[in-house]
């Protein structure tokens, strides 16, 4: 069995995005010696995957993002992948990683580390102008960093969001003016 649930573990309507939960005899029973982590993902026999998705009218499941890749800014949910997808459409941007930046007023804001093609450069105002008609205003990054070389990658050559975020917040990658 599969269902899509909201943050209160209530099933959502068809087409609405929520966390994917699975119930099966093949589900794991626990994380070994990790009761707290087990209790977070196994709720009433349902395993919460950490993936966000929806079930369409034909019953097909579409995964849209990871729960951990969601920025919550003042109660609004922002998908890192959605913002990255829009940034990829800019002709000067080679790659980008979007992540949450702590903020006292909103809880989190949108931050991004960018690697430009051919050492091109843009000001953050120019990038914001590009994004204005593509994203809701609250989804547009407020913090920018510029990678001198390619963005950090993990062992499988995937972009490393966690490492990039740490480098940016620790000021090891320069801020884009």
Question: Which residues fall in each region the model found?
Answer:
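Flexible lysine-rich "adenylation lid" loop at the C-terminal edge of ANL adenylation domains
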Residues: 9, 148-168
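Acidic/polar alpha-helix N-cap and adjacent early helical turns
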Residues: 165-177
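A short acidic/small-residue loop/turn micro-motif
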Residues: 19, 69, 166-168
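Regulatory helix in c-di-GMP signaling enzymes, encompassing the GGDEF I-site helix
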Residues: 131, 144, 157
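AMP-binding/adenylate-forming catalytic core of the ANL superfamily
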Residues: 8, 24, 29-30, 52-139, ...
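Conserved ATP/PPi-binding loop(s) of AMP-dependent carboxylate-activating enzymes
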Residues: 10-41, 76-78
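Conserved beta-loop-beta connector loops within the AMP-binding
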Residues: 1-21, 57-58, 120-124, 160
């Amino acid at each position: 069995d599969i269902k899509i649930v909201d943050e209160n573990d209530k099933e959502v309507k068809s087409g609405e995005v929520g966390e994917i939960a699975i119930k099966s005899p093949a589900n794991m029973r626990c994380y070994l010696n990790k009761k707290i982590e087990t209790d977070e993902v196994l709720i009433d026999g349902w395993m919460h995957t950490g993936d966000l998705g929806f079930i369409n009218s034909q019953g097909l499941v579409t995964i849209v993002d990871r729960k951990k890749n969601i920025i919550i800014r003042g109660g609004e949910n922002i998908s890192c992948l959605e913002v990255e997808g829009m940034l990829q459409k800019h002709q000067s941007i080679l790659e980008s990683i979007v992540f949450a930046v702590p903020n006292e007023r909103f809880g989190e804001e949108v931050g991004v580390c960018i690697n430009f093609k051919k050492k091109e450069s843009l000001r953050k105002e120019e990038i914001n102008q590009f994004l204005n008609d593509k994203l809701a205003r609250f989804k547009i990054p407020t913090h920018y960093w510029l990678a001198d070389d390619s963005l950090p990658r993990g062992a499988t050559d995937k972009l490393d969001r966690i490492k990039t975020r740490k480098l940016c917040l620790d000021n090891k990658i320069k801020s884009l003016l």
